[in-house]
């Protein structure tokens, strides 16, 4: 460990040198070489100092490794194009932060200081797991208790470390944080579902001590249904917001923001406000994508994108507002390119983890509601959102999953969507029946594609599916290691069986080397830079 800490110290000294160096890239080459040694040694040492993957410090290490690689890439370009000091400082500050966080995390791992994971540190999905497992425990014990021993059960239940009321409160906090950026109709529905959940939780706890086990079982089931209802709707609201945000990224892009600021700085405030709102939405989508995702590499990439976008969000608009000069143009250009690259990575990784059938279903719901709408602006918007589905299948991993019939229908989708875009964007008046006809064809083609994908997904696992039927009342979610696994099916993410997030009993050596593979990925990136 002393060698790792010494390498980090050397890296920090080189970053300090970078603040004062102008045009000299020698210190950056030395930094890359030293950091490569550090990452290689860390890969060999990590199974020893972090035997379990379920660790906040390990997550921080992976995030920092990814951020260092990202910053080095853009810092190299910044130096080569002789961008101004403020551009260089932006990336140096982020590198410095990463090195300091790496130092803290490694020190805690070396000292066997396991960070206490409070409820505040749990994701929405982890909190749902805790709450549902909590209720499962209670229901199992309730079934074994006679009425005369029910009071003993109630006393032991309330003494649990993670009291259910506290867990539910944190679930509601996550849901309301998302509701703050959700579309208006979903915000109202999420708020109502949160109120219902809190009411059911209050009833469950207020009735503690009720001598009738039948009543207690009904109250527990009502609370469980309220939890499922909230999780299920949040999945759908997340998909709604994804459609809205990805389109808003086009309508309020950095390029359009830059043009608006150059033409009319005062009049660009509305676009700046829309840009800020969309960044808040992207952050919430990312947070929930991390919570729902099963793969540690995917989680790390999303975390890194969010970290980059958050740091850029604070400085990209001011960069575009700087007085026009060569240095300010270079500064804005570097930040703009970095921003667009991070958005592209974010968009691709979200499309990679999202469930294709659920995405199409969500769009079909929106399309079905608006087919007969006469307002042309609304029709343009809904057709534009269809491009999100097309983009989803531009990703090789999603397109390759289509059968031959699916690929044929996908071609039909592209053709009919182009027709819809053409007809709603015509400047001359168009017979509404022509628009409705094309939208109905679009709906039919999408429904056919959805049915083909769902059929293909079910056929390989039909034997498994027959053994573990999903109840009709279940939400469209599932969990990593929760006992409620069989009851839940997440609509946001693909339903994959190979989960690479470790339970507390798993070790790095026994986990398929996912953590080591992730470090190998980072090392490869660093080598590519050299």
From Swiss-Prot:
Pfam families: Serendipity_A. It is a peripheral membrane protein. Its main location: cytoplasm. Transmembrane segments: none annotated. Transient expression in blastoderm from nuclear cycle 11 to the onset of gastrulation. GO terms for molecular function: actin filament binding; beta-catenin binding. The keyword Cell membrane applies. The keyword Hydrolase does not apply. InterPro entries: Serendipity_A. It is found in: Cytoplasm; Cell membrane. GO terms for biological process: actin filament organization; cell migration; cell-cell adhesion; cellularization. Keywords: Cell membrane, Cytoplasm, Developmental protein, Membrane. Required for the cellularization of the syncytial blastoderm embryo. Involved in the localization of the actin filaments just prior to and during plasma membrane invagination. Sry-alpha together with nullo and bnk may provide auxiliary functions, by acting both to stabilize a large and dynamic microfilament structure and regulate its functions. This is Serendipity locus protein alpha. It comes from Drosophila melanogaster (Fruit fly). The lineage of its organism: Eukaryota, Metazoa, Ecdysozoa, Arthropoda, Hexapoda. The gene is Sry-alpha.
